[in-house]
Curated annotation (Swiss-Prot):
Alphabetized CDD domains for the sequence: STKc_ULK1 (cd14202)
Task of the protein: Serine/threonine-protein kinase involved in autophagy in response to starvation. Acts upstream of phosphatidylinositol 3-kinase PIK3C3 to regulate the formation of autophagophores, the precursors of autophagosomes. Part of regulatory feedback loops in autophagy: acts both as a downstream effector and negative regulator of mammalian target of rapamycin complex 1 (mTORC1) via interaction with RPTOR. Activated via phosphorylation by AMPK and also acts as a regulator of AMPK by mediating phosphorylation of AMPK subunits PRKAA1, PRKAB2 and PRKAG1, leading to negatively regulate AMPK activity.
Name the UniProt record assigns to this protein: Serine/threonine-protein kinase ULK1
Region Disordered, residue ranges: 283-323, 335-358, 394-554, 661-686, 727-787
Activity-regulation annotation: Acetylation by KAT5/TIP60 stimulates the protein kinase activity. The protein kinase activity is activated by unanchored 'Lys-63'-linked polyubiquitin chains: unanchored 'Lys-63'-linked polyubiquitin chains are catalyzed by TRIM32 in an AMBRA1-dependent manner.
PANTHER family membership: SERINE/THREONINE-PROTEIN KINASE UNC-51-RELATED, SERINE_THREONINE-PROTEIN KINASE ULK1
Stretches for region C-terminal domain: 829-1051
Modified residues (Phosphoserine): S317, S403, S450, S467, S477, S479, S521, S555, S637, S638, S757, S774, S777
UniProt family annotation: Belongs to the protein kinase superfamily. Ser/Thr protein kinase family. APG1/unc-51/ULK1 subfamily.
Assembly information from the UniProt record: Interacts with GABARAP and GABARAPL2. Interacts (via C-terminus) with ATG13. Part of a complex consisting of ATG13, ATG101, ULK1 and RB1CC1. Associates with the mammalian target of rapamycin complex 1 (mTORC1) through an interaction with RPTOR; the association depends on nutrient conditions and is reduced during starvation. Interacts with FEZ1; SCOC interferes with FEZ1-binding. Interacts with TBC1D14. Interacts (phosphorylated form) with TRIM5. When phosphorylated at Ser-317, interacts with MEFV and BECN1 simultaneously. Interacts with TRIM21 and IRF3, in the presence of TRIM21.
Chain spans, region Interaction with GABARAP and GABARAPL2: 287-416
Ligand binding (ATP): I22, G23, H24, G25, A26, F27, A28, V29, V30, K46
Catalytic reactions on record: L-seryl-[protein] + ATP = O-phospho-L-seryl-[protein] + ADP + H(+); L-threonyl-[protein] + ATP = O-phospho-L-threonyl-[protein] + ADP + H(+)
Length: 1051
């Protein structure tokens, strides 16, 4: 390898920069490079440190030569190999789709046809390896890479699967190999984990576990540690994986044959290569694969299964909507579109286009529109089988009420299209608006008479963005459409998507008409929910899931997904269409009261635009004429909050797209405190009350989103028409975000996401115990969130944000860069390795950490003693001491060194004991070599070495002192480390109490904590029971004082 210019390094005919880091593991680092002449040829350069390799370098070279000869489309190609003094460089094929582990993390599960596509390619690579006698022995999703020739949004059928990282594990040192096993024990065969003799069938077991995870989302046999998994395999002679019932027979038989504990009973390679499931002509259960999700750094994709909750995806943005719209000219065309979607499975279109839609099963009736018009639910609900057809089949004629006996004479035509509606039987009556909505009703009438709205018929087939899109069917209204509103009917048949009119996924908060059948909830609230059956599963006639139009949710979660079912709100006659959604059944969260199922918040991808609960949905891209009754300025950083407010019954209409600096022009508060903030729901008489489960959003969240914005200057409504006042609360300090104070181009106001649940009961509106994640530019107050520690600034008023400790970053994309539909990504923090470790490992690590903290405090005391000794050696001090008759005081410098030596000896003893404990626990297998353990042990070792060096230096410095001053040795025996530590702790408590008495409380709490830590350490080292009891009493007093002090600060 030769260093190039600008930090570019060369490996043979290839070059790379260490800035382009792709990934790293326990033994190697991978960089992205390219060919020096053919720049379009991208490669991956893996750098392996020779310290991680065993002595058999010649065998590694032979193995690499063999791998260079393996030319297969499903094996990562090895282009070049260079061995340097300290490292080995492997130049391999670059795969732009990431690995299968990331793919499954995004999609959770794959359909059987996608599993077969991937498995056929894996089998092709294994056929070549098996013919050459090569055993992989480490097959796992992380070692299966994906390549997308067609780009990031390639169809799953176009994804190329490639096996990587085989043959190298055998040359790793034994202890390093043990660390690797901690990462992937679930995919290793039982004979490998139990250290028995194994052959090539071990790879077949790994393939079985990978297929099982692709199908169900988890490994077939799991344990908290490799030791537990080994014990599980040793105790259970027969293993039977839990295969879902709806799995096809060929795939079930394949899994059972691959996942045999005894390798003799396991199928061989010939049976595997010729298995019926791998045969493309074998009829299996079809499920359309979901398009490939967009990764930040790769373009791999997946397919979604109908058996589990899919990963969160984003709805289409406003920029994508014009490409997704389909124009309908009549109700018959609208119904025909539904029929066409159902029958389009046999079309000869491109696979990318057909796979973007889900084919409605043939058993669904074709006269959906006719039955919807008669105010009856369809006999069989449109349940999407795991993918995302979006059809809003609800019909409603705004401003018209049905006659006492509404009937609709329509019969489906032979082509499946319904006949025309006899809408002349229905009498039309003009609804009387409430007094506060007179102006809005006049605007509504103007919109109804607008020629552009009467002549424009819209319908859009929603394409899935990422993996899926929020799906739902609008429910039918008892009001049939009039014969003059054919265009409006086509609009109401629009298959809703990312427009403001499309409802977002939420269960149990939509008021219902009396004509709809309902599912009783445990609390008595009426909830219409349903779950999509697997393809081929039958739905009984009496099943509750057939009573509502349902679908699987693949969209981003709203902040109110965990709301308790609220009482039904009275709906005016002009209320827009509602929609019911069927959330996926997940096993992780406990069901909320009143909900059939609820989904945990998994971050926040792009949220759909907020609901516009005006009587008419606006035309996409046209200005809105209807005036809002509650006029909230729409900022890019508050889209998700507007969704929540609209869902809770607040009528909102965006006047126009405005940014925060525009709003600041109409804001009379330029950093001043304003009135009472948000009024309670009972004062406003509006449906803005908090439900019992709104722990994900507090009143502080609403203040942060809307508090810094005054009423929109472009609105013609007066303040008297707005019964709700949005202003920053005086209890929160009344201060604005720095970006909101300036009149220039500044960042939008921060949106505060509360993480975790508040205490039981109602959360105070002025609560400051929240964690702030700023949505917006980098100038937001708190853009870094910590998953472990939260620190509140003591003594600060409400304007001081909560400072999160350094940790994992919850990065939220800038909404300005993505317009109003910008992707809001939540990067979940990685779980610490100790999460799945055994209790003995956790307890030992806690003990090591405590030893390290205690030793550091003792070293601070030793440093203070050393500084006092240095000061005593100064000329001024010696001049003053020359007149003192006491000889011991003349030797104060040496005395300080003696105290320092005793403390360093104590530290060395503690650290030596901790290191020995770690070694014993590691040898016993109770302490795993995780990165945290390595870091703590490394720090313990460093401090131990430093303490030993300090002891040696001090002993040399005091050697003459001990020889000349023999009489002082008797006094030195009375100096013990425990006595010095106790004395220092008492002094710290006394000084803190003295400062507290004089109202200097800034540094009291840290000193109390340090003293408490020192006393805790003494309690572990002392042997005299009386001393231990005295220390316990001192600790109790300090803890009481700390409790009183903290309650006074945070009150």
């Amino acid at each position: 390898m030769e260093p190039g210019r600008g930090g570019v390094e060369t490996v043979g005919k290839f070059e790379f920069s260490r800035k382009d880091l792709i990934g790293h593991g326990a033994f190697a680092v991978v960089f992205k490079g390219r060919h020096r002449e053919k720049h379009d040829l991208e490669v991956a350069v893996k750098c392996i440190n020779k310290k991680n390799l065993a002595k058999s370098q010649t065998l590694l070279g032979k193995e690499i030569k063999i791998l260079k000869e393996l030319k297969h489309e499903n094996i990562v190609a090895l282009y070049d190999f260079q061995e340097m003094a300290n490292s080995v460089y492997l130049v391999m094929e670059y795969c732009n789709g990431g690995d299968l582990a990331d793919y499954l993390h995004t999609m959770r599960t794959l359909s059987e046809d996608t599993v077969r596509l991937f498995l056929q390619q894996i089998a092709g690579a294994m056929r070549l390896l098996h013919s050459k006698g090569i055993i992989h022995r480490d097959l796992k999703p992380q070692n299966i890479l994906l390549s997308n020739p067609g780009g990031r949004r390639a169809n799953p059928s176009n994804i190329r699967v490639k096996i990587a990282d085989f043959g190298f594990a055998r040359y790793l040192q034994s202890n390093m190999m043990a660390a690797t096993l901690c990462g992937s024990p679930m995919y290793m065969a039982p004979e490998v984990i139990m250290s028995q003799h194994y052959d090539g069938k071990a790879d077949l077991w790994s393939i079985g576990t990978i297929v099982y995870q692709c199908l169900t989302g988890k490994a077939p046999f799991q344990a908290s540690s490799p030791q537990d998994l080994r014990l599980f395999y040793e105790k259970n002679k027969t293993l039977v994986p839990a295969i879902p019932r709806e799995t096809s027979a060929p795939l079930r038989q394949l899994l059972l044959a691959l996942l045999q504990r005894n390798h003799k009973d396991r199928m061989d390679f010939d049976e595997f290569f010729h298995h019926p499931f791998l045969d493309a002509s074998t009829p299996i259960k079809k499920s359309p694969p979901v398009p490939v999700p967009s990764y930040p750094s790769s373009g791999s994709g997946s397919s979604s299964s109908s058996s589990s909750a899919s990963h969160l995806a984003s709805p289409p943005s406003l920029g994508e909507m014009p490409q997704l719209q389909k124009t309908l000219t009549s109700p018959a065309d609208a119904a025909g579109f539904l029929q066409g979607s159902r029958d389009s499975g046999g079309s000869s279109k491109d696979s990318c286009d057909t796979d973007d839609f889900v084919m409605v099963p043939a058993q669904f009736p074709g006269d959906l529109v006719a039955e919807a018009a008669s105010a009856k639910p369809p006999p069989d609900s449109l349940l999407c089988s795991g993918s995302s057809l979006v059809a809003s089949a609800g019909l409603e004629s705004h401003g018209r009420t049905p006659s006492p006996s509404p009937t609709c004479s329509s019969s489906p035509s032979p082509s499946g299209r319904p006949g025309p509606f006899s809408s002349n039987r229905y009498g039309a009556s003009v609804p009387i608006p409430v007094p506060t909505q007179v102006h809005n009703y006049q605007r509504i009438e103007q919109n109804l008479q607008s020629p552009t709205q009467q002549q424009t018929a819209r319908s859009s087939a929603i394409r899935r963005s990422g993996s899926t899109t929020p799906l739902g069917f609008g429910r039918a209204s008892p009001s049939p459409p009039s014969h003059t509103d054919g265009a409006m009917l086509a609009r109401k048949l629009s298959l809703g998507g990312g427009r403001p009119y499309t409802p977002s996924p939420q269960v149990g908060t939509i008021p219902e008409r009396p004509s709809w059948s309902r599912v009783p909830s445990p609390q008595g609230a009426d909830v219409r929910v349903g779950r999509s059956p697997r393809p081929g599963s039958s739905v009984p006639e009496h099943s509750p899931r057939t009573t509502g139009l349902g679908c699987r949710l693949h969209s981003a979660p709203n902040l109110s997904d965990f709301h308790v079912v609220r009482p039904k709100l009275p709906k005016p006659p002009t209320d827009p269409l509602g929609a019911t959604f069927s959330p996926p059944q997940t096993s992780a969260p406990q069901p909320c009261p009143g909900l059939q199922s609820c989904r945990p918040l998994r971050g926040s991808p792009k949220l759909p635009d907020f609901l516009q609960r005006s009587p008419l949905p606006p035309i996409l891209g046209s200005p809105t004429k209807a005036g809002p009754s509650f006029d909230f300025p729409k900022t890019p950083s508050s889209q998700n909050l507007l969704t929540l407010l609209a869902r809770q019954g607040v009528v909102m209409t965006p006047p126009r797209n405005r940014t925060l600096p525009d709003l600041s022009e109409a804001s009379p508060f330029h950093g001043q405190q304003l009135g009472s903030g948000l009024r309670p729901a009972e004062d406003t008489r509006g449906p803005f009350g908090r439900s019992f489960s709104t722990s994900r959003i507090t009143d502080l969240l609403l203040k942060a989103a809307f508090g810094t914005q005054a009423s929109d200057s472009g609105s013609t409504d007066s303040l008297q028409e707005k019964p709700m006042e949005i202003a920053p609360s005086a209890g929160f300090g009344g201060t604005l975000h720095p970006g909101a104070r300036g009149g220039g181009a500044s960042s939008p106001a921060p949106v505060v996401f509360t993480v975790g649940s508040p205490p039981s009961g109602a959360t105070p509106p002025q609560s400051t115990r929240t964690r702030m994640f700023s949505v917006g530019s980098s100038s937001s107050l708190g853009s870094t969130g910590s998953s472990s520690a939260r620190h509140l600034v003591p003594g600060a008023c409400g304007e001081a944000p909560e400072l999160s400790a350094p940790g994992h970053c919850c990065s939220l994309a800038d909404p300005l860069a993505a317009n109003l539909e910008g992707a809001v990504t939540f990067e979940a923090p990685d779980l610490p390795e100790e999460t799945l470790m055994e209790q003995e490992h956790t307890e030992t690590l806690h003990s090591l950490r405590f030893t390290l903290a205690f030793a550091q405090q003792v070293l601070e005391i030793a440093a203070l003693k050393g500084s006092a000794s240095e000061a005593a050696g100064g000329p001024e001090y010696q001049l003053q001491e020359s007149v003192v008759a006491d000889q011991i005081s003349q030797l104060s410098r040496e005395w300080g060194f003696a105290e320092q030596l005793v403390l360093y000896l104590k530290v060395a003893e503690l650290l030596s004991s901790g290191l020995q404990t770690a070694i014993d626990q590691i040898r016993a297998g109770k302490l795993c070599l995780s990165s945290t353990v390595k870091q703590v042990v490394r720090r313990l070792n460093e401090l131990y070495k430093a303490s030993v060096v300090s002891c040696q230096g001090l002993s040399l410095r005091l050697q003459r002192f001990f020889l000349d001053k023999q009489r002082l040795l008797d006094g030195i025996h009375g100096v013990t480390a425990e006595r010095l530590i106790l004395s220092h702790a008492v002094q710290m408590v006394q000084s803190a109490a003295l400062d507290e008495m004089f109202q200097h409380r800034e540094g009291c709490v840290p000193r109390y904590h340090k003293a408490l830590l020192l006393l805790e350490g003494l309690q572990h080292t002392l042997t005299d029971q009386a001393d231990i009891e005295n220390i316990a009493k001192c600790k109790l007093c300090i803890e009481r004082r700390l409790s009183a002090l903290l309650s006074g600060v945070y009150a």
